[in-house]
Amino acid sequence: MTVLHSVDFFPSGKAPVAIEPRLPQSAFPEHHHDFHEIVIVEHGTGIHVFNGQPYTISGGTVCFVRDHDRHLYEHTDNLCLTNVLYRSPDAFQFLAGLNQLLPQEQDGQYPSHWRVNQSALQQVRQLVAQMENAGDEMDTPAVANREILFMQLLVLLRKSSLMEGAANNDARLNQLLAWLEDHFAEEVCWESIADKFSLSLRTLHRQLKQQTGLTPQRYLNRLRLIKARHLLRHSDESVTDIAYRCGFGDSNHFSTLFRREFDWSPRDIRQGRDALLQ
């Protein structure tokens, strides 16, 4: 597995933070780093496989990667990221207690992926731009200024994420996307889902298409196919059982959609013929 080292990314041996844009981020094999990373998705879509689990990511997704996590990107479509790298929560000169603003593992579950709305994403861009323009000077005021900007970024992400609740349409859509991530296998009536999240059906279609580039049903199908591919790789269940488990009522239809999405059949994935994509 590829290991990325801080010496190749940070401007100096003492710099606590570095900014790495990926515009766009192409498919990238599994790797880990000797530093921590906040991945901010600007726009586009892709699959983020994080510690073996696949997540659909799009504009407004924020992922917190620790120095022992492994991850990869695949099936990317104009996926543009900004990576904010930092050595560790304890490596700052003027900041303490940062763990309280970061996601925390509970009962073995690490909530690595947050979502922020488009208004917050614009504020994030402005903060990141300030961090990029702060320069690499290592005198005390310059270091303090960069650390303050990093703290402001964490506070903004925390306040804007789903964890803090939300009230506007943009935020309701984020809640809906998070709900689909957990309930993708259920039968979905879009009118009922729109009502559940206090959105009009037209607003749901328009905003989801704007944020992901996909219609609601196309997004749901892709989500189901991603989960199915994960099971094909990591379980012994039959193709038919996996199709039903992931919300498809007909295994032949599932196989057709699967090949159309990934250019491989479910049987190819089961036999490991897609190694080039991993």
UniProtKB/Swiss-Prot annotation:
Name of the protein this chain belongs to: HTH-type transcriptional activator RhaS
GO CC terms in record: cytoplasm
GO biological process: positive regulation of DNA-templated transcription; rhamnose metabolic process
DNA-binding region: 191-212, 239-262
GO MF, any single term: sequence-specific DNA binding
SUPFAM superfamilies assigned to the protein according to its UniProt record, in alphabetical order: Homeodomain-like (SSF46689), Regulatory protein AraC (SSF51215)
This protein's record includes keyword ATP-binding: no
SMART domains: HTH_ARAC (SM00342)
Transmembrane segments: none
InterPro entries associated with the record: AraC-bd, AraC_XylS_family_regulators, Homeodomain-like_sf, HTH-like, HTH_AraC, HTH_AraC-typ_CS, RhaR_RhaS-like_N, RmlC-like_jellyroll
Name of the gene encoding the protein in the UniProt record: rhaS
Marked site (Interaction with sigma-70) residue numbers: 241, 250
Residues annotated as domain HTH araC/xylS-type: 174-272
NCBIfam families associated with the record: PRK13503.1
Function: Activates expression of the rhaBAD and rhaT operons.
Subunit structure: Binds DNA as a dimer.
Location(s), subcellular: Cytoplasm
Keywords: Activator, Cytoplasm, DNA-binding, Repeat, Rhamnose metabolism, Transcription, Transcription regulation
